[in-house]
């Protein structure tokens, strides 16, 4: 329930709070259009001091030709591009809500995704999520750019724990070179072994480091497979 705020009327809507690899989300079943995602309202709900608190908000809506549509909103309010960990959480939410079975296909801003609930016990689950084809690979300032459903910058570093993710991430996120995509998510990647990466991500919209980023992990793996170890078939 959102109240005691002059900006918004009192309302009561059921929601789920899901977390995947440290990314947390508010999820609403919006098949009956009960929620109007105004940016100021989304930001208020995601506020960690005065709202529910989340990295983002997602809506499950009806979609012809798929089990449902996933809409993702950044914690600062506007609708955004694909979120990988959000997609995994949405798949489990859809299963819990009866919107899909164990195997499902859902639409998102970047196209159709297929997901499968591999295990489900209580409120937890293990989800396999298919991503759309990465595109736009290019060299960028001291790193690389690739779009994995969201635009990502990837830079390899010697020690990811020593990186000023917030400061350097904010600088790179706002570079003029990335203005055409509305800014970019910034990933700092340490090669911890053959086929093993350590990744820290600064996410646009959250405007800070997050505990994980699904599309960022995919971006790191895509870039690493091209420029660091092209013969490795599996990357952790």
Name each region found by the language model:
Residues 123-132:
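Short, solvent-exposed secondary-structure boundary/capping segments
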